[in-house]
Swiss-Prot record:
Absolutely required for transposition of IS1. This is Insertion element IS1 5 protein InsA. Belongs to the IS1 elements InsA family. The lineage of its organism: Bacteria, Pseudomonadati, Pseudomonadota, Gammaproteobacteria, Enterobacterales. GO terms for biological process: DNA transposition. Keywords: DNA recombination, Transposable element, Transposition. PANTHER family: INSERTION ELEMENT IS1 1 PROTEIN INSA-RELATED.
Length: 91
């Protein structure tokens, strides 16, 4: 059986990563025993994927409208507005 090495997105550790149940959609969740962060590799909703926030900010800075951004990315208008509203705060 082949094993796949999964690294923690927070601390980049590979040796302390263990499976940690499943999400409500049935996707495998993982837990890093070093930093105690949990994550999953697959997402059901597009807005939950890593990098979505930065894509929304980049599109806004390039002059793409909110409704067009929502349509292109496949997320709701309120999601776009929430990301833009929270972009001024430090993440």
């Amino acid at each position: 059986m082949a094993s796949v090495s999964i690294s923690c997105p927070s601390c980049s550790a590979t040796d302390g990563v263990v499976r940690n149940g499943k999400s409500t959609a049935g996707h495998q969740r993982y837990l890093c025993s070093h930093c105690r962060k949990t994550w999953q590799l697959q997402f059901t909703y597009t807005a939950s994927q890593p990098g979505t926030h930065q894509k929304i900010i980049d599109m806004a800075m390039n002059g793409v409208g909110c409704r067009a951004t929502a349509r292109i990315m496949g997320v709701g208008l309120n999601t776009i507005l929430r990301h833009l509203k929270n972009s001024g705060r430090s993440r």
